[in-house]
Swiss-Prot record:
Record-linked Pfam families: AceK_kinase, AceK_regulatory
GO molecular function per UniProt: [isocitrate dehydrogenase (NADP+)] kinase activity; AMP binding; ATP binding; phosphoprotein phosphatase activity; protein serine/threonine kinase activity
Entry annotated with the keyword Cell inner membrane: no
Catalysis performed (reactions): L-seryl-[isocitrate dehydrogenase] + ATP = O-phospho-L-seryl-[isocitrate dehydrogenase] + ADP + H(+)
Active-site positions on this chain: 384
Name of the featured protein: Isocitrate dehydrogenase kinase/phosphatase
Gene: aceK
EC number, as in UniProt: 2.7.11.5, 3.1.3.-
Subcellular location: Cytoplasm
InterPro entries: AceK_kinase, AceK_regulatory, Isocitrate_DH_AceK
Lineage start: Bacteria, Pseudomonadati, Pseudomonadota, Betaproteobacteria, Burkholderiales
Length: 607
């Protein structure tokens, strides 16, 4: 039962609510400014600038939360505000959000501020937004006609599609000229005809495109949908810099699976300017019904909102399931304890209190590695993580063996409490949550010859794409990689990662005498950050099927020259091209030399 006050009698309550909303409004204004700046950086080809924008934006949220807390402490002694006043603060805040264009994000910001001031015993709907209070439906009706959430175009006929797409692209007003937009728009129309065949044009035949471009890595994406009769189809057109220095439309993506990969949890967040983010999410969910709202908000760079929605989805799942959390199957890690709920497609990772040999690390160092991944372009090859503190789980849902494992190996990370409903709970002080995947070592052990071949092809591609993005995985055992439902290999164990540019790529020196040659021990000096690619075969090529696949697809993997080549390019300032689709889909391959490739090289497929 709610205990909200009947009267809003406190001026301080209103002032605090206003201060908190001002903090959020500042955050979202800066968030949008970065997204607008991304367009300018893309136009001039400032790839390092785009990467810096991405890193800066990730830090914005916590900076604004901290600023708001400092203001509340200085002006209102926030820690001493009485419970009844906090309830009035929430009600005032709801009132201030009535006509707000980002109410769901503002509610999450309120939660972030409050939960860093008050004890977790207050984390309920009387004080924070456990459930949303303001609807986000149809907010777009109040948008400016100058830039609505999406624009509608009417080709009129199959023959009118090329001119329609030319108009769509021109409406984004990119400052850099196109190499041949008429040609590329014709390719888009041709690809659509090839995909759908000679389809019948319905009276409602139209194309909708979101009004802002989606920026990531070195690509700008037009995101849209085609409506014809009762059917809706996704449509994505990537725009890249060509070798000529001008812009080209690289391809058109029309398969829903392709779009799912584009919005995968293994990719960096998009930078996109949104006045009404909930309207963008609604549009994208129409294209990707299998994606949760939490996943889509996260892909749009609103990871705190995604994290909030994920937790609500998780609580809902707990209410409607009865299985128990268990220790995750597979080889135990030396740094993390990993557990899972079989009915829920995620794993929970807790840093151990003690690290057995040969691991030499600390809790803070491990957390810094995970933060590095959060800020880096994951190029479709590193799983995103959700980081939570003080998460309360029903103790009755934990397997006894898992509880003993946590008590033995991570006692400082857990405590017990009783909920307001009188239920025993286990509180995990710090946890990472990741999408559950099939460990690659299990995939290779149990797979058919064809699956093994695919797994090794993907593994080699994943490592090569990571080092091209300046990430050295460190521990490259197969158990540290997973296979997604799309068959892609993704890295997910980050405690040993380093920047490749910080590593010394070395060849094993020749033995100086017979004793060294016959020695089972390393006879040469190994310094910190030294890597010896030719030694990796010792722990990667034990299985004959794996060895055959490796030699077939990646014979250069164990050659130090390949690794040094990537390092040299990175040190020279090169930014690699990573696209989340097969190179065969590109117009340059489909329609010949008239379609020009990127300014540097053939992009890797990062999907």
């Amino acid at each position: 039962m709610s205990h909200f006050p009947k009267l809003l009698s406190s001026q301080i309550a209103y002032d605090v609510a206003r201060t908190m909303l001002d903090g959020f409004d500042k955050h979202y204004r800066l968030f949008r400014e970065v997204s607008i700046e991304a367009k300018a950086r893309f136009e001039v080809g400032d790839w390092h600038g785009l990467q810096q924008l991405q890193r800066d934006r990730i830090a914005f949220y916590n900076q604004r939360v901290h600023e708001t807390i400092v203001t509340l402490q200085d002006e209102y002694d926030a820690e001493d505000i009485e419970d009844e006043i906090w309830q009035q603060i929430k009600l005032h805040y709801i009132g201030l959000l009535t006509n707000h264009h980002q109410p769901e994000l503002a509610e999450t910001f309120f939660n972030s501020v409050f939960t860093r001031i008050q004890h977790r015993s207050y984390f309920n709907n009387d004080f924070i937004f456990v459930r949303p209070a303001i609807s986000t439906e149809y907010i777009e009706n109040e948008e400016s006609p100058i830039k609505p959430t999406y624009r509608a175009y009417y080709p009129g006929s199959r023959e009118g599609m090329a001119a329609c797409f030319e108009r769509i692209v021109n409406n984004f007003q990119l400052e850099r000229p196109f190499e041949d937009l008429k040609r590329d728009a014709g390719y888009v129309a041709r690809a659509i005809t090839e995909h759908f065949g000679e389809f019948r044009i319905a009276p409602n035949f139209q194309v909708h495109t979101l009004s802002s471009l989606f920026f990531r890595n070195k690509t700008a994406f037009v995101i849209g949908r085609v409506i014809n009769g009762d059917h809706t189809y996704p449509l994505v057109v990537p725009i890249i810099h060509a070798a000529s220095g001008k812009l080209v439309l690289d391809t058109v993506l029309l398969h829903r699976e392709q779009i799912l990969i584009l919005f995968s949890f293994a990719h960096a967040y998009f930078m996109v300017d949104m006045e009404i983010p909930s309207a963008y999410v609604t549009f994208l969910r129409d294209l990707l019904p299998r994606k949760s709202r939490a996943e889509i908000y996260t892909s749009l760079g609103l990871q705190k909102q995604g994290k909030n929605l994920f937790y609500r989805d998780f609580l809902h799942h707990l209410q409607h399931s009865s299985d128990k959390f268990i220790s995750a199957p597979g080889i135990k890690g030396l740094v993390m304890l990993v557990f899972t709920l079989p009915s829920f497609p995620y794993v929970f990772k807790v840093i151990r209190d003690f690290f057995p040999a040969p691991k030499e690390t600390t809790r803070e160092l491990v957390k810094s590695k995970y933060q590095l991944v959060k800020q880096h372009d994951r190029v479709g090859r590193m799983a995103d993580t959700l980081e939570y503190s003080d998460v309360a789980f029903p103790l009755s849902r934990f397997d006894d063996a898992l509880v003993r494992e946590l008590e033995q190996h991570a006692p400082s990370m857990i405590e017990y409490q009783r909920s307001k409903q009188g239920e025993d709970e286990i509180v995990v002080r710090h946890v990472y949550i990741e999408r559950r995947m099939t460990p690659l070592n299990i995939w290779l052990q149990e797979g058919t010859d064809e699956q093994v071949d695919h797994g090794i092809l993907e593994y080699g591609n994943a490592v090569k794409e990571l080092i091209a993005a300046n990430i050295f995985p460190g521990d490259m055992l197969y158990k540290n990689f997973g296979v997604t439902r799309h068959g892609r290999v993704v890295f997910y164990d980050y405690d040993e990662i380093e920047y490749l540019t910080d590593c010394n790529v070395r060849r094993v020196p020749a033995p100086r005498n017979e004793e060294e040659e016959m020695s089972g021990e390393v006879w040469y000096t190994v310094r910190p950050h030294d890597i010896f690619p030719e030694t990796y075969g010792t722990f990667l090529l034990g299985d004959p099927r794996v060895r055959a696949a490796f030699m077939r697809h990646h014979p250069d993997f164990f050659d130090a020259a390949m690794w040094q080549h990537h390092k040299d390019r990175l040190l020279a300032g090169h930014v690699h091209d990573f696209f989340a689709y097969h190179s065969q889909e590109r117009f340059i391959h489909r329609y010949g030399s008239g379609a020009t490739g990127p300014a540097t090289e053939e992009p890797r497929r990062a999907a």
